[in-house]
Amino acid sequence: MKKIESHKLHGGDLQVWQHTSATTHTEMKFAIYLPPKAIAHETAETTETTGQRCAVLYWLSGLTCTEQNFIQKSGFAEYASRHNVIVVAPDTSPRGVDISGNDVPDDSAYDLGQGAGFYVNATQAPWATHFQMYDY
């Protein structure tokens, strides 16, 4: 996995990660917000090597969204920070090319193909190879 963004926000840390998914056979991204209590801290009195356990909320965006829509537009971080909630926002679908260099199927309709945001496993060609979003 590779961290591609990191931003301090309401005392916590908003990160975006990219990884190769064995489920979609593509590079996928997800955002994660770690509230202050989830982050390890060092003070003069103590050194915490791990943060505290926090509840986790998985946000699944809708049609035409990416992992960026929710984290940029919702204003969630203040609440998540105050209530010690880790928020995970995955991308909505595979995009671009797969790990073999083949194009991921797409469609000209906004509600089918890349960015469609259906969290189900496709069962028919050409979608079944990459669109396994329930499992992802």
Label the model's feature ranges.
Residues 1-136:
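Non-catalytic cap/lid and distal C-terminal segments of serine-dependent acyl enzymes
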